[in-house]
Amino acid sequence: MVEILDYTKALEVLKEYPSGDGLHVDTLLDSDNHGALTYNDFLILPGSITFSAADVSLDTKVTRRFTIKAPLLSSPMDTVTEHNMAIHMALLGGLGVIHNNCPPDDQAEMVRKVKRYENGFILDPVVLSPSTTVAEAKELKTKWNFGGFPVTEKGTLHSKLLGIVTSRDIQFHKTPEDPVTAVMSTDLVTAPAGTTLAEANEVLRSSKKGKLPIVDKDGLLVSLLSRSDLMKNIHYPLASKLPSKQLLCAAAISTHDADKVRLQKLVDAGLDIVVVDSSQGNSMYQIAMIKWIKSTFPDIDIIAGNIVTREQAAALIAAGADGLRIGMGSGSACITQEVMAVGRPQAASVRSVSAFAARFGVPTIADGGVQNLGHIVKGLALGASAVMMGSLLAGTTESPGEYYVSNEGQLVKAFRGMGSIAVMEDKGKSGGGKNAGASRYFSENDKVKVAQGVAGSVVDRGSITQYVPYLVAGIQHSLQDIGVQDLEALHTGVNNGQVRFEMRSASAQTEGNVHGLHSHEKKLYSS
């Protein structure tokens, strides 16, 4: 008969057990015993809840220098991230990586749009001259997706301020050939150079103007402040911004020498982080490119990859990488593992590379294999600082391309892997030059293109302004269940064995999903 113990001694009796319930992460991922695992093959065991989900911080480093407030990145794929996605990912606390399957000038223009979108003091505003026509002002409004352009004597910064042309001034003006001086507002509220951002915000707040020009003692325009940016600061408190209040922006380049010119254009446009994009990151080409970037642009942080082993990581860290991108063949539109017989299951990859990179203070990004919110949490638990998403974001409003109705009657958007034949043979986006898909997979000179990806479609997910907050809230609740209040505590708990894991059999995976119902509706979130 089992002895019934004093219930008040339960916590003391628990200490008699040699280890916590479940498995240590190293036991979980011991591939010698049970093969390498991926996200569906395990669960994280719950801990103790002593705080609210709202108190969970998701601040994380994506490179040695840059920290974001939501551990989420959008992939540099031509059906996922252009300037609209990059802007909204940054506003929501993450980071968008603009793809490079386009001419360098087009990519630089996208970077420029991100950097202009939200600012404190706008140090390089779009300035009009007295000879600019109303029609030209309308074209600029369409191009930049904002209005309120200062007009100066020379049409440049550091020139005498004459007025401001607002959207209302030009919207219904019937003679487009008129100069903007005929419609501009001259009743201006300005602030003197040297005004602090807080003081300037207060002047703008108390005025009824949309823009606040900052002028020097001679009345020359030196910068601009926007009321719409104040509203963005209220609506997007997690925004990934620099001290200058500009949004953080990343963009991809290939390992080819020709992209050195591309990178110069991106840097001139204001780029913060460059992602050296390759399907197999441990190459002489990428190592040479990293070293060149470090010597030429020391203020630009480099995310290198993709890799799946410690050996690959060591080579890129030694070359100077500031962050690592993990994943090979695990993406939803990727067939590298099937075709090349090269790669690694994503859970094993993330743990191996992240544990090694952490010893050098290099953050890692789990890229690929993410099918749902739970996979994001598992990637973070295995040591990644952030998770990169492709197909999860491809169906959102902010991704490139138009919606269409599938044969099944669903609203979908096109999505294609960068290793697909559709991308490798697409000369349109690349401007007839080198193709980013072929470059990524070292196939640009091949007579026979071997696909390492597929093209397809993904179901409409709505706007990321709703979807990303759902992901953020879900990660916070998950960390609350695990019993850790931030990502550093999660990583520490996993490493010291306090955060435990359990493997899942096929039956366990079935049990952990919806089962036994006649029918159901799977609505993931409401807002």
From Swiss-Prot:
Inhibition and activation profile: Mycophenolic acid (MPA) is a non-competitive inhibitor that prevents formation of the closed enzyme conformation by binding to the same site as the amobile flap. In contrast, mizoribine monophosphate (MZP) is a competitive inhibitor that induces the closed conformation. MPA is a potent inhibitor of mammalian IMPDHs but a poor inhibitor of the bacterial enzymes. MZP is a more potent inhibitor of bacterial IMPDH.
Record's catalysed reaction(s): IMP + NAD(+) + H2O = XMP + NADH + H(+)
SMART domains hit by this protein: CBS, IMPDH
Main localization category: cytoplasm
Biological pathway: Purine metabolism; XMP biosynthesis via de novo pathway; XMP from IMP: step 1/1
Record-linked Gene3D superfamilies: Aldolase class I (3.20.20.70)
UniProt binding sites for IMP: S332, D367, G368, G369, G390, S391, Q452
Record's keyword annotation contains Repeat: yes
Keyword line: CBS domain, Cytoplasm, GMP biosynthesis, Metal-binding, NAD, Oxidoreductase, Potassium, Purine biosynthesis, Repeat
Region listing for Disordered, in residue ranges: 506-527
Basic and acidic residues composition bias: residue spans: 518-527
Subunit description: Homotetramer.
Name listed for the protein in its UniProt record: Inosine-5'-monophosphate dehydrogenase
Organism per entry: Penicillium brevicompactum
